[in-house]
Regions:
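Active-site-proximal loop/turn and secondary-structure-junction residues that shape catalytic pockets
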Residues: 17-19, 41-43, 75-78, 111-115, ...
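Conserved beta-strand positions in the central sheet of alpha/beta enzyme cores
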Residues: 38, 71-73, 108, 146, ...
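Glycine-rich, proline-tolerant flexible connector loops at the mouths of alpha/beta enzymes
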Residues: 39-62, 112-118
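Short, solvent-exposed loop/turn segments at secondary-structure boundaries
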Residues: 48-52, 81-86, 118-123, 186-189, ...
Length: 282
């Protein structure tokens, strides 16, 4: 029985950080206590590029294994802002189709890259135009977009994330919180971002990093204020998803993704944080 002081959050994770094969992804996540998976790719193919047959096969595998999908981790908006609006609208429709086939409510997106010599303020209107177009599609498709604060996109610092959310003003656009990404752009996540973004925060991406060199480390071992954030989210009544996105391959020499070993390290590190905060993950 969960103590009265505890709450429960649904644990998920980026399956393709474990292996290209979704069967392996599911097995490892379930062994770590997760009942959800965040789908970015399967069989080495990005989610927006999977064929109808591949999507159907993936849906069948998930159903067979009793695994649900927390979000579609799409690449939408992770392109230069100079591309036409329609470029990402078309890809979002494919992501929305994948969400429907796999039974997911959320689609992770970004707010566009821009050239090194381009002043960030000069692209603001173009970004807002594109984000409004994406939100309109999301409303039409019945999904919710989660903006991730990726390093070097327009919305990589709290004020610009808030500007996007408030300017678009759509129930279909919310915030995915990534503490490591904030650290990598010099932001103190809890002190400088939490209060501003909490009203719109609907999804937690579990990643930590160091201010000194930007390296990603297991949750609670960096400067991302993971414990304070989890404690505050618990106090605020957050009951959403916590999705493991370790990015630990470099630290553990496992190649292009975390792999099962580093993913397990990441999961156990986050379990220590949640246990200290009185949060149970299921």
């Amino acid at each position: 029985m969960v103590p009265a002081t505890q709450v429960s959050w649904a644990l998920s994770g980026f399956g393709d950080e474990i292996d290209d094969d979704p069967a392996v992804q599911i097995a490892v996540l379930q062994a770590l206590g997760a009942s959800y998976i965040e789908v970015r790719s399967a069989w080495g193919t990005n989610i927006v590029d999977l064929s109808d047959d591949q999507l159907a096969a993936l849906a069948g595998l998930l159903k067979e294994k009793g695994m649900q999908v927390s979000a579609i981790a799409s690449p939408i908006g992770k392109v230069d802002v100079s591309l036409p609006v329609e470029h990402e609208v078309e890809r979002l429709r494919r992501a929305a189709n994948a969400a429907k086939v796999l039974g997911a409510k959320y689609i992770r997106i970004f707010s566009f890259y821009y050239g090194e010599s381009v002043p960030v303020d000069s692209i603001r209107d173009a970004v807002i135009e594109r984000m409004r177009a994406l939100a309109a599609v999301a409303e039409e498709e019945g999904v919710v977009l989660l903006h991730e604060n990726e390093k070097d996109i327009f919305g990589d610092v709290p004020d610009r994330v808030l500007d996007i959310i408030e300017s678009v003003n759509s129930p279909a656009l919310k915030v995915a919180w990534d503490a490591a990404n904030f650290v990598q752009v010099g932001v103190k996540p809890f002190d400088e971002a939490y209060a501003k973004l909490r009203p719109h925060l609907e999804y937690l991406q579990v990643k930590d990093a160091l201010f000194s060199n930007g390296h990603v480390v297991p949750a609670g071992e960096g400067d991302g204020d993971l414990l304070r954030t989890v404690e505050a989210l618990k106090a605020d009544g957050f009951t959403g998803f916590a999705s493991l996105e370790p990015h630990l391959a470099g630290a553990h020499g496992l190649g292009g993704f975390s792999g099962p070993t580093a993913f397990g390290i990441a999961a156990r590190a986050f379990a220590k944080v949640t246990a200290e905060a009185g949060v149970q993950t299921v």
